[in-house]
Amino acid sequence: MRKPIIAGNWKMNKTLSEAQSFAEAVKNAVPSNDVVDAVIGSPALFLAPLAWNLKDSEVKLAAQNCYWENAGAFTGENSPAAIADLGVDYVIIGHSERREYFHETDEDINKKAKAIFANGMTPIFCCGETLETYEAGKTAEWIEGQITKGLVGLSNEQVASMVIAYEPIWAIGTGKSADANIADEICGVVRSTVEKLYGKEVSEAVRIQYGGSVKPENIAEYMAKENVDGALVGGASLEADSFLALLDAVK
């Protein structure tokens, strides 16, 4: 039985005071980690104070990105070793916004995944297709390619422990969402690709999220599906009440 994981991706939103107010509102209200993993994907600026705010709570922290080197002349980048030292559990990598706006490649994302594991954290590895790819019927082929290139060189144990988030680009922040059956089908493609590469035991262990205009009103439909183990949520994770409602719908 795979434990559900609900991760909020705040993207480039909130001030420090807003982030800390959110943390105070949710830290004693989230369900137990025995039931569901509750994760906040915060801007890097807030990770240190939030780690302090949330140190005795069930909420886990995710960075939204990191570099693949621990130190060096990489102005403006965030060291995975430094992120881990703050007590961060997860790092989101491969998000479509990083791929599109910052030209990150599958090879870049693969190096980041290895660095994240090397520093004792867990990647939330994002994959997803454009509307053009979806309408051309090439979603499965596209997703298989992203996963195959993005996970190369990782061990069975590492892949089994990671989180893979399927986010159709055409559903991110648009108000549109892939219906639950489509989400289940493509999350099934993710799982079958992992099985081809790493075997059935690993594919049955890896947790797969759906992301793309998920909100409290529709999350239960997705979570009822066999291949959907959680959600990577953008806008609906920005308000404490909404984030808690997402978790309540899952527990």
Curated annotation (Swiss-Prot):
Q: Which reaction does it catalyse?
A: D-glyceraldehyde 3-phosphate = dihydroxyacetone phosphate
The pathway to which it is assigned is: Carbohydrate biosynthesis; gluconeogenesis; Carbohydrate degradation; glycolysis; D-glyceraldehyde 3-phosphate from glycerone phosphate: step 1/1
Taking the record's annotation, the residue ranges forming a coiled coil are: none
What is the scientific name of the source organism? Enterococcus faecalis (strain ATCC 700802 / V583)
Mind listing the UniProt keywords for this protein, alphabetically?
A: Cytoplasm, Gluconeogenesis, Glycolysis, Isomerase
Residues annotated as transmembrane: none
Entry EC no(s): 5.3.1.1
Q: Which GO terms describe its molecular function?
A: triose-phosphate isomerase activity
* Annotated GO biological process: gluconeogenesis; glyceraldehyde-3-phosphate biosynthetic process; glycerol catabolic process; glycolytic process
Please list the residues that bind substrate: N9, W10, K11, G173, S213, G234, G235
Q: How does it assemble?
A: Homodimer.
Where found, per UniProt? Cytoplasm
What is the name attached to this protein's record?
Answer: Triosephosphate isomerase
What's this protein's function? Involved in the gluconeogenesis. Catalyzes stereospecifically the conversion of dihydroxyacetone phosphate (DHAP) to D-glyceraldehyde-3-phosphate (G3P).
- State the family it belongs to: Belongs to the triosephosphate isomerase family.
- What do the Gene Ontology cellular component annotations say? cytosol
Query: What HAMAP family does UniProt report for this protein, alphabetically?
Result: TIM_B
